[in-house]
Amino acid sequence: MGKLTLLLLAILVWLQYSLWFGKNGIHDYSRVNDDVAAQQATNAKLKARNDQLFAEIDDLNGGQEALEERARNELSMTKPGETFYRLVPDASKRAQTAGQNNR
């Protein structure tokens, strides 16, 4: 019985080593799970960005309002007959704002 017990103990030790440290063991499993979680988080961010871009494309294809708003905000364009006014804060307010931002 001593040899059989020793053999079974050796097999148990080998199986435990394979489970914890071997290829496709617990360490590899946890690393892959972490990689999967990180990839799923990245995919969720990219999906949200794609959804936002698709909504913007639909707005631009669907109507003139979105196109007009974008032209006004990003390119400072105006319609014929309109006057563009830019409001610039006075120098004392700009100095106060700059002083607060430097703190």
UniProtKB/Swiss-Prot annotation:
Keywords: Cell cycle, Cell division, Cell inner membrane, Cell membrane, Coiled coil, Membrane, Transmembrane, Transmembrane helix
InterPro entries for the chain: Cell_div_FtsB (IPR023081), FtsL/DivIC (IPR007060)
Pfam families reported for this sequence: DivIC
Keyword Signal: no
GO cellular component terms given for this protein: cell division site; cell septum; plasma membrane
Stretches of the chain found on the membrane's Cytoplasmic side: 1-3
Membrane-protein topology: Single-pass type II membrane protein
Membrane topology, Periplasmic segments: 22-103
Coiled coil start-end: 31-71
One Gene Ontology term from the biological process aspect of the record: FtsZ-dependent cytokinesis
Subcellular location: Cell inner membrane
Residue ranges of the TM segments: 4-21
Function noted in UniProt: Essential cell division protein. May link together the upstream cell division proteins, which are predominantly cytoplasmic, with the downstream cell division proteins, which are predominantly periplasmic.
Family designation: Belongs to the FtsB family.
Complex formation: Part of a complex composed of FtsB, FtsL and FtsQ.
PANTHER family found in the cross-reference section: CELL DIVISION PROTEIN FTSB (PTHR37485:SF1)
Protein name, per record: Cell division protein FtsB
Originating organism: Escherichia fergusonii (strain ATCC 35469 / DSM 13698 / CCUG 18766 / IAM 14443 / JCM 21226 / LMG 7866 / NBRC 102419 / NCTC 12128 / CDC 0568-73)
Gene name of the encoded protein: ftsB
